[in-house]
């Protein structure tokens, strides 16, 4: 019956989860159309690949569609969704479409509150290095591939498993990774952490009898669910109890060096690893990839090469290079290194700040942060205050609502007041995101680290800052001048 579906329409096609599935379906030969409220790099890429993309939503966009795909970000009263239902065109949740893709290959699904995108990308990179040509659907753009997704010819498909709306329960992979479990998206689970943990148990229990769960034993909540899991398990982490663990860990020039100890059948195999990412959290992500690829049976040389050559993921500690600081009025000069990151949960932010401190020791850390969602700010308010107070300088802009209504005392000004009471850092409130670039230039000094974090519109700050600085440099900076680099870090989960 599947042959009757030829044209698939994606409502919100520019989203990170939707665009990847759309690209794979396009590569499979389906006619793909979609709509989004904004033009973007992603929508333009899909157009070049042959998709029809509309900016804005209208009933006419779905007139010839055989199926319409939506995500939980799309409201039920969306005109395209309403038109599809009235015409009896199937409206398919994104997760179910992803589950259909998993049926075509052997699925490797990565779940967890933090680290999904990087871990998925690392596993994909090792499979590719080993010549396995995997299909992948990732929440961020894999720099080596220049895309969120790719249809490979190999037997494996590697995907992120999204717990935010419990949609990962539709997936039935043969290998399931759980990186960690933390309090986030709690509205989905009726603010019951027990229900969130049970969802992860149910996700793992969907494995076939010949499948394997790969679990991080560094995480207390993962340890708590392990007794309820009846499927085969491989453990990884920094803990000495892990079957795949790391020893002799050290930072060096933005990379992590360690020895991977792989326990198999009572014997331990050692791999010398250079990971082209900073931070202990990325060592954990790499260990997950090593555990999965060891289970698949990939050669050690592919693991070592892929981790050393890893090009990174869009907005995950993404480095934009040296940004000049030139101000003719004050005579200020020098430069900083610009890094963009997607982190927006306090745990992720703490890990990335620690990675920045480790990669660039002794430098002043300027944090520019846009909170994401009023509900998250409310639920994790004290955790945000704690992690934001670890910056040396803090630029704080208003919450990115993601469609939510404002919540009293869950906005950025409330965060700023609490931070002032704590007294560890004096927050500088920047009303609008488009004013952050000027604020950064006014506050940054030579050899600073400026970390800008957030999952919302703050994602446009780093590329704009980099582009504008390059233009300025051509106009104002003599190529003969010798300036030492500093560090600017933009972070967002």
From Swiss-Prot:
<dbReference type="InterPro" id="IPR004101">
    <property type="entry name" value="Mur_ligase_C"/>
</dbReference>
<dbReference type="GO" id="GO:0008360">
    <property type="term" value="P:regulation of cell shape"/>
</dbReference>
<keyword id="KW-0133">Cell shape</keyword>
<protein>
    <recommendedName>
        <fullName>UDP-N-acetylmuramate--L-alanine ligase</fullName>
        <ecNumber>6.3.2.8</ecNumber>
    </recommendedName>
</protein>
<feature type="binding site">
    <location>
        <begin position="112"/>
        <end position="118"/>
    </location>
    <ligand>
        <name>ATP</name>
    </ligand>
</feature>
<dbReference type="GO" id="GO:0051301">
    <property type="term" value="P:cell division"/>
</dbReference>
<dbReference type="InterPro" id="IPR036565">
    <property type="entry name" value="Mur-like_cat_sf"/>
</dbReference>
<dbReference type="InterPro" id="IPR000713">
    <property type="entry name" value="Mur_ligase_N"/>
</dbReference>
<comment type="similarity">
    <text>Belongs to the MurCDEF family.</text>
</comment>
<keyword id="KW-0963">Cytoplasm</keyword>
<comment type="pathway">
    <text>Cell wall biogenesis; peptidoglycan biosynthesis.</text>
</comment>
<keyword id="KW-0573">Peptidoglycan synthesis</keyword>
<dbReference type="GO" id="GO:0071555">
    <property type="term" value="P:cell wall organization"/>
</dbReference>
<comment type="function">
    <text>Cell wall formation.</text>
</comment>
<dbReference type="GO" id="GO:0005737">
    <property type="term" value="C:cytoplasm"/>
</dbReference>
<keyword id="KW-0961">Cell wall biogenesis/degradation</keyword>
<keyword id="KW-0131">Cell cycle</keyword>
<dbReference type="GO" id="GO:0008763">
    <property type="term" value="F:UDP-N-acetylmuramate-L-alanine ligase activity"/>
</dbReference>
<dbReference type="InterPro" id="IPR050061">
    <property type="entry name" value="MurCDEF_pg_biosynth"/>
</dbReference>
<keyword id="KW-0547">Nucleotide-binding</keyword>
<dbReference type="Pfam" id="PF08245">
    <property type="entry name" value="Mur_ligase_M"/>
</dbReference>
<keyword id="KW-0132">Cell division</keyword>
<dbReference type="GO" id="GO:0009252">
    <property type="term" value="P:peptidoglycan biosynthetic process"/>
</dbReference>
<dbReference type="InterPro" id="IPR013221">
    <property type="entry name" value="Mur_ligase_cen"/>
</dbReference>
<dbReference type="GO" id="GO:0005524">
    <property type="term" value="F:ATP binding"/>
</dbReference>
<dbReference type="Pfam" id="PF02875">
    <property type="entry name" value="Mur_ligase_C"/>
</dbReference>
<dbReference type="InterPro" id="IPR005758">
    <property type="entry name" value="UDP-N-AcMur_Ala_ligase_MurC"/>
</dbReference>
<keyword id="KW-0067">ATP-binding</keyword>
<dbReference type="InterPro" id="IPR036615">
    <property type="entry name" value="Mur_ligase_C_dom_sf"/>
</dbReference>
<keyword id="KW-0436">Ligase</keyword>
<dbReference type="Pfam" id="PF01225">
    <property type="entry name" value="Mur_ligase"/>
</dbReference>
């Amino acid at each position: 019956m599947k042959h009757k579906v030829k044209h698939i329409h994606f409502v919100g096609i520019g989203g990170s989860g939707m665009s990847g599935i759309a690209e794979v379906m396009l590569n499979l030969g389906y006619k793909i159309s979609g709509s989004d409220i904004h033009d973007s790099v992603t929508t333009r890429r899909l157009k070049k690949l042959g998709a029809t993309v509309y900016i804005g939503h209208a009933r006419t966009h779905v007139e010839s569609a055989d199926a319409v795909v939506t995500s939980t970000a799309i409201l039920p009263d969306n005109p395209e969704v309403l038109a599809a239902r009235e015409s009896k065109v199937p409206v398919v949740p994104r997760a179910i479409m992803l589950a259909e893709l998993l049926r075509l290959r052997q699925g490797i699904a990565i779940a967890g509150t933090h680290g999904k995108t990087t871990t998925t990308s690392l596993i994909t990179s090792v499979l590719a290095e080993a010549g396995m040509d995997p299909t992948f659907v990732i929440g961020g753009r894999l720099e080596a591939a220049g895309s969120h997704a790719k249809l490979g010819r190999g037997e494996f498909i590697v995907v992120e498993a999204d717990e935010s709306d419990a949609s990962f329960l539709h997936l039935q992979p043969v290998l399931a990774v759980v990186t960690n479990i933390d309090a986030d998206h709690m509205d989905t689970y009726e603010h019951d952490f027990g229900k969130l943990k049970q969802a992860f148990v149910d996700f793992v229990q969907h494995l076939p009898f010949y499948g394997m769960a790969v679990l991080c034993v560094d995480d207390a909540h993962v340890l708590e669910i392990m007794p309820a899991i009846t499927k085969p398990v491989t453990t990884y982490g920094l803990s000495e109890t892990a079957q795949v663990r790391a020893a002799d860990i050290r930072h060096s020039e933005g990379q992590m060096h360690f020895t991977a100890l792989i326990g198999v059948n009572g014997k331990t195999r050692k791999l010398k690893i250079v990971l082209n990412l900073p931070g202990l959290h990325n060592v954990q992500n790499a260990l997950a990839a090593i555990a999965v690829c060891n289970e698949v049976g990939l050669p050690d040389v592919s693991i070592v090469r892929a981790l050393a050559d890893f090009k990174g993921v869009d907005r995950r500690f993404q480095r934009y290079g040296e940004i000049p600081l030139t101000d003719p009025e004050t005579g200020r000069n020098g430069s900083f290194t610009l890094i963009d990151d997607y982190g927006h949960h306090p745990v992720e932010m703490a890990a990335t700040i620690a990675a920045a401190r480790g990669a660039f020791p002794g430098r002043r850390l300027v944090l520019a942060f846009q909170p994401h969602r009023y509900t998250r700010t409310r639920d994790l308010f004290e955790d945000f205050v704690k992690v934001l107070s670890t910056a040396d300088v803090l630029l704080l802009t208003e919450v990115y609502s993601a469609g939510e209504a404002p919540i009293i005392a869950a906005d950025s000004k409330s965060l700023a007041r609490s931070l002032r009471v704590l007294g560890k850092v004096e927050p500088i409130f920047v009303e609008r995101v488009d004013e952050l670039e000027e604020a950064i230039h006014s506050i940054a000094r030579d050899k600073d680290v400026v970390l800008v974090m957030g999952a919302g519109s703050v994602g446009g700050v780093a590329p704009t800052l980099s582009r504008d600085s390059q233009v300025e440099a051509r106009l104002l900076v003599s190529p003969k001048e010798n300036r030492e680099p500093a560090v600017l870090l933009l972070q967002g989960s």
